[in-house]
Amino acid sequence: WIMGHMVNAIEQVDEFLNLGANAIELDIDFDKDGIAQITHHGIPCDCGRECTKKAIFTEYLDNIRQVTTPDNPKFREQLVLLALDLKLQRISSAKAYRAGEDVAKKLLDHYWQRGNSRARAYILLNIPLVEDCEFIRAFKDTLKNEGYESYNDKVGINFTGNEDLDKIRDVLEILGIHKQVWQADGITSCFARGTERLKEALEKRDTPGYNYINKVYAWTLVRKSIMRRSLRLGVDGVMSNNPDRVIKVLKEKEFADKFRLATYNDNPWEKFRG
């Protein structure tokens, strides 16, 4: 999975897909009451990027629904995963439950259209910290209460704050989540980061019977040398400001026979058995 980073303006969707991304990350900004308002990262952000691009969240969902719906004029077959980077750290943790309800309802109304949409992308909920876990509970409660629990099959969980992996496992256990879990490891492209935690996540992913990590990705990679390092370790995905660079690295002799781009036929919730 090549995840285009910080794709917050509607016009950026095609831009990043044209560069080779098959997944996109969008930042969800909330008001003080936990209502999802806009797709927006804000300052500071990655080096060399414009931090202020934005869109109304519901309008973004209306557009991306078309982009991921077969036979729609806007359909782009390659886009199979949407990572919602939830800016919960900007609101009180007491509002995390309200935020989860709101995002679930907006997805139901504007993306899935309560069963009337054929939009097919998988959804990854990127949670900043384990203290925000009530968002997950609320999201799942809302799907159940609204009568659409079946959409849980399309939704995965990912904690992005580089916290202790055993701490994350404990929270997932409390929430009763034993599948459809991704694990991110990374830092803004402005800084260097070692591989100790990334290696630990990959080791846990590959441990038989360990159900709390199905996929691992590294972020935000812009240098080809770091992309190569991550691929050698065996990551499932790379988040980048430059998907075209990832494409070029994947075509190199060292990687061409080991990796390929994920398609809709690849289940993002299953561990890869190479």
Swiss-Prot record:
MF annotations from Gene Ontology: lyase activity; metal ion binding; phosphoric diester hydrolase activity; toxin activity
Binding site for Mg(2+): E25, D27, D85
Subcellular localization: Secreted
Cofactor note: Binds 1 Mg(2+) ion per subunit.
Active-site residue list: H5, H41 (nucleophile)
Keyword ATP-binding: no
Keyword terms: Cytolysis, Dermonecrotic toxin, Disulfide bond, Hemolysis, Lipid degradation, Lipid metabolism, Lyase, Magnesium, Metal-binding, Secreted, Toxin
UniProt catalytic activity: an N-(acyl)-sphingosylphosphocholine = an N-(acyl)-sphingosyl-1,3-cyclic phosphate + choline; an N-(acyl)-sphingosylphosphoethanolamine = an N-(acyl)-sphingosyl-1,3-cyclic phosphate + ethanolamine; a 1-acyl-sn-glycero-3-phosphocholine = a 1-acyl-sn-glycero-2,3-cyclic phosphate + choline; a 1-acyl-sn-glycero-3-phosphoethanolamine = a 1-acyl-sn-glycero-2,3-cyclic phosphate + ethanolamine
Chief location of this protein within or outside the cell: secreted
Biological processes annotated in GO: killing of cells of another organism; lipid catabolic process
Tissue specificity field: Expressed by the venom gland.
Similarity field: Belongs to the arthropod phospholipase D family. Class II subfamily.
Protein name per its UniProtKB record: Dermonecrotic toxin SdSicTox-betaIIB1bi
